[in-house]
């Protein structure tokens, strides 16, 4: 089940959303010529490593990586999957709360996502990279504010592929339930994997809650 389109506001240009997508793509392209060893060093330097922050809370660089890690991705599939979700769902939230507040909202839910993942895995020395946590916050906000919007999805039935339109509440609820189950199983020793599911959960919950705060500011579109 892959979302490919939704109902968008007419006559609105979500340039902050475009800027976020363009920045993520540019960083990925910039790093493409690097060797595997150089990439490992770069990700270790600019990825978010929970152990680095929890072992030394006064380490300023560790706090900076909360932001830099949001623009790094582990591969082309990781990048394109994240950007697809941001492209589809981000513009509605930017329209709802305005350009500047959307940028603040995006980074705020990204921080919340990182905090929950670090709380669950405080001793992890594996760099966390990706915009998934922040985008999960966008999804949480979308679920609350646009539950009845129709989302076009690619639906796979064995070898048959169909495009169907279903309410956002169904698409995003299924997505969140999957994150919950995956997060639970990642707590089982030996099942940790390489996905920060609790960042997804934390970001989604933060977005669901914080959008109610952001809508109180002037400029909110009802």
What does each of the following model-derived ranges do?
Residues 1-222:
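A detector for small-residue-rich transmembrane helices and their helix-helix packing motifs
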